UniProtKB/Swiss-Prot annotation:
Enzyme Commission code: 2.7.1.92
Single GO term (MF): ATP binding
Name this polypeptide is given: 5-dehydro-2-deoxygluconokinase
Key word Iron present: no
GO BP, one annotated term: inositol catabolic process
Family membership noted in the UniProt record: Belongs to the carbohydrate kinase PfkB family.
Pathway(s) of this molecule: Polyol metabolism; myo-inositol degradation into acetyl-CoA; acetyl-CoA from myo-inositol: step 5/7
UniProt enzyme class: transferase
Source species of the chain: Bacillus velezensis (strain DSM 23117 / BGSC 10A6 / LMG 26770 / FZB42) (Bacillus amyloliquefaciens subsp. plantarum)
Length: 330
């Protein structure tokens, strides 16, 4: 089964939300208190997905707000260098800064992030800074859950979703739950549900769907039944090492297993998964193959130091899939 888009659109994907700075520990297996050197990368889920999509050959654009400083200029320059259109990235003139994420890599199983997100520029994207014509010219709009955490970014995203629905642009909601940006579980559930019910494709981990539903131990069947009663026609639920599932409105269920790899760190997997899954759909692969692309891409990124810089090319993804299938005798 294949997923179809309006092929008359110029952009394959336009993402909206945060673009920030990742400072990843260059010294492994030690606590942050003892870490002295970090490597700088562009971070933020929607920015990573846009970068990953561009590296896979898709035409990607980005809507967001950056600070008027060295970090802001680095973000724009880096994304442009990776092929992302940044014409809709506005500059904050009020002195707000980029979000900073310091990562600690104690072991492949124990990684943590120290996040600085107070009064950051990306959460001050105004609805008036969302261009209708730009979104209307995309096959899909990628929305990140974190952008819903505060106003005015929240209203800017809701406006973008409204525009997409108006112009036959598929809405892809990457749940991207980050607890440090939200005031309460109830608030998170309200806004996640609001956008999920308007989305054509919803992607997240089982835990993130539980956050959206404000409960624990939820089941996939109940989740997809609720979303299919609204706008969704494809729901992807990830279960970590147990693989991922895609549920279609027509009743079909697809599964991809997680690919074995030497894990360096745990962050970045979700963004690389989303970009490769989207690439698979846009390039005309069937849903099961797109799931495999997502799983393979995630396994590549968790084996490397960065998230955005480690986003693989299509050839790397296909090579890994073929190698694993050969190893498994398939």
């Amino acid at each position: 089964m294949k997923y179809t888009f309006n092929e008359e659109k110029e952009f394959d994907i336009v993402a909206i939300g945060r673009a920030c700075i990742d400072l990843n520990a260059a010294e492994y297996n030690r606590p942050m208190e003892e870490t002295m050197t970090f490597s700088k990368y562009v971070g933020g889920s929607p920015a990573n997905i846009a970068i990953g999509s561009a590296k896979l050959g898709l035409k990607a654009g980005f809507i967001g707000k950056i600070p008027d400083d060295q970090h802001g200029r680095f973000i724009v320059s880096y994304m442009q260098g990776k092929g992302v259109d940044t014409s809709q990235m506005t500059v904050d003139r009020e002195g707000r800064k980029a979000g900073l994420a310091f990562t600690e890599i104690l072991s492949p199983e124990e990684c943590s992030i120290l996040m600085y997100r107070d009064d950051v520029a990306d959460l001050y994207l105004e609805p008036s800074e969302v261009n209708e014509g730009y979104i209307a010219n995309a096959k899909m709009l990628l929305v990140s859950g974190t952008a819903l955490a505060k106003s005015p970014s929240r209203e800017a995203v809701l406006k973008a979703v409204h525009i997409a629905k108006k112009h036959d642009v598929k809405v892809v909601f990457e749940l991207d739950y980050r607890p440090y940006t939200w005031q309460s579980a109830e608030e998170t559930a309200v806004y996640y549900t609001l956008v999920a019910e308007q989305s054509d494709i919803v992607i997240g981990t089982r835990d993130e769907f539980d956050v959206m539903e404000n409960r624990s131990g939820g089941g996939n069947d109940e989740t997809v039944r609720h979303l299919f009663a609204h706008s969704a026609d494809l729901v992807v639920i990830k279960h970590g090492v147990d693989g991922s599932y895609a549920y279609s409105r027509s009743g079909e269920v697809f599964r991809a297993h997680a690919y074995k790899t030497k894990v360096l760190k745990t962050f970045g997997a979700g963004d690389s998964y989303a970009s490769a899954f989207i690439y698979g759909l846009v390039s005309g692969r069937d849903i099961e193959t797109a799931l495999k692309y997502g799983s393979a891409s995630a396994s590549i990124v968790v084996s490397k130091h960065s998230s955005s810089e480690a986003m693989p090319a299509a050839g790397e993804i296909i090579e890994l899939i073929e190698a694993q299938h050969s190893l498994n005798g398939k």
